[in-house]
């Protein structure tokens, strides 16, 4: 069976499309969720390094990102040590440039994303099922927000930060994501729906925070490693911001978790 030129072009377009990268990210993430704890930790450390590197390059602090995985490990294994460590590292990088602005950037980069991503590990320690539910809920919100906003969106939510995101997309994403949480979390339908709404709203805030940084530094995406999805920071922003909130909710019903 011969493949026509048109079929080749169509196949090539799909491989570069948003849908292809979405499926690729989704399948890879599902495989990662079920990894043993030690391998899962390595993946989170890589994600921490990748996100920190993208944001560091965008902010012009190219040396700081090496230390972000170290901060994550320090907080995870010996949390009282993390804050003095962050302070010392921030002062070191500020001293090299002798700029207060550099101190604030360095401190931010050492906190972000390390002290957020560590909660993905903590969620998995409570239950792989909860981690699966959390990530699926974020995905459902993202997918419905994108397609509802694209097809029905008329009202910009925060046009100065992200003019393409709409009120309709936001409400649609949060509605369907919260319905998923309502059907899967063990807190009753109404409570689970409301908890899901709160978690997803925090995730949307993370998305806007990322957009704010991009607008400040004048870039469209933090990288193009995932094609139209952008970079690691663009793809996992909502997940990063909402992980601590979801973990705290899970802790409310568990006795074997710690902050």
UniProtKB/Swiss-Prot annotation:
Record-level Gene Ontology MF annotations: phosphatidate cytidylyltransferase activity
Catalytic activity, EC: 2.7.7.41
Catalysis performed (reactions): a 1,2-diacyl-sn-glycero-3-phosphate + CTP + H(+) = a CDP-1,2-diacyl-sn-glycerol + diphosphate
Principal location listed in the UniProt entry: membrane
Bilayer topology: Multi-pass membrane protein
Lipid biosynthesis in keyword set: yes
UniProt pathway annotation: Phospholipid metabolism; CDP-diacylglycerol biosynthesis; CDP-diacylglycerol from sn-glycerol 3-phosphate: step 3/3
A biological process term (GO) from this entry: CDP-diacylglycerol biosynthetic process
Pfam families recorded: CTP_transf_1
Bilayer-spanning residue ranges: 31-51, 69-89, 103-123, 129-149, 170-190, 193-213, 236-256
GO CC, any one term: plasma membrane
Sorted UniProt keywords: Cell membrane, Lipid biosynthesis, Lipid metabolism, Membrane, Nucleotidyltransferase, Phospholipid biosynthesis, Phospholipid metabolism, Transferase, Transmembrane, Transmembrane helix
Record's subcellular location: Cell membrane
Family: Belongs to the CDS family.
Entry protein name: Phosphatidate cytidylyltransferase
Taxonomic source organism: Aquifex aeolicus (strain VF5)
């Amino acid at each position: 069976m011969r493949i026509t030129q048109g079929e080749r072009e169509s196949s090539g377009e799909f491989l570069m499309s948003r849908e292809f990268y979405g499926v690729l990210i989704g399948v890879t993430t599902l495989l990662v969720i079920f990894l043993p704890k030690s391998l899962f930790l390595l993946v989170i450390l890589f994600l921490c390094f990748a996100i920190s590197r993208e944001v560091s390059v965008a902010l012009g602090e190219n040396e700081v990102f090496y230390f972000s995985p170290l901060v994550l490990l320090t907080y995870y294994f010996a949390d009282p040590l993390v804050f003095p460590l962050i302070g010392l590292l921030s002062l070191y990088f500020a001293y090299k440039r002798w700029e207060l602005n550099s101190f604030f950037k360095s401190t931010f980069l050492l906190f972000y994303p390390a002290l957020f991503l560590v909660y993905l590990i903590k969620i998995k320690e409570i239950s792989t099922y909860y981690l699966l539910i959390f990530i699926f809920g974020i995905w459902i919100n993202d997918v419905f927000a994108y397609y509802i906003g694209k097809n029905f969106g008329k009202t910009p939510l925060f046009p100065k930060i992200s003019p393409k995101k709409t009120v309709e997309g936001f409400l649609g994403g949060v509605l369907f994501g919260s319905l998923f949480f309502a059907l899967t979390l063990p807190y009753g339908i109404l409570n689970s729906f409301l908890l899901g709404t709160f978690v997803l709203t925090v995730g949307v805030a993370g998305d806007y925070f990322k957009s704010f940084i991009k607008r400040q530094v004048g870039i469209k995406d933090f990288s193009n490693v995932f094609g139209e999805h952008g970079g690691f920071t663009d793809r996992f922003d909502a997940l990063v911001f909402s992980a601590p909130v979801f973990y705290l909710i899970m802790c409310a019903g568990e006795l074997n978790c710690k902050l």
